[in-house]
Amino acid sequence: MLKANVGSSVLKCAKAAGKEAALAAAVGLEKVGALFVYGSCGYDTAEMMSGVREALPNVPAFGNTSFTGIITPDGFVSSDDGFVGAMALSDPAMKTGAAASERGSNPVETGRKVALEAMKAAGMETAPNFFYMAASPAEEEFYLKGISSVIGRVPFFGGSAADNSISGDWKLFCGDKNF
């Protein structure tokens, strides 16, 4: 049975905050199969994700920066010093493959490449039941064309990265990759 849990942190140190949020999200879950991470543009996102990976090594972790804060079951989480939220998913039958890439010169081709990499990471040769995608604003449709050329039409969810001033300072991250 699918279970989910959420953790967050407003610690000033990005690495410590990433670790704290990831550990809190994993509480009570047998085996975390995927971790969605959303954080502040004020953090060094490479450091934040380093803390996440330290807390939950070998768990596919991915996400993006968020506009001024995140919403959790406990309410709105934000801080001038930074914030991070994580949602852990756990299910014995879950197979997760995560992949990411910089835009490149052809976002349709990038989407195709990322879909193939994610399927390989999940150990799957068939289309997933659903997928998640986050991208920079105005590029999502191009990536989706490339992804759907590989896996066909399957349900998906996700969104666009953001920053506090919508000026292009947003970040996307997956494992140890930051864009």
Where do the PLM segments sit?
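Cofactor- and metal-binding active-site motifs of prokaryotic enzymes
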Residues: M1-F179
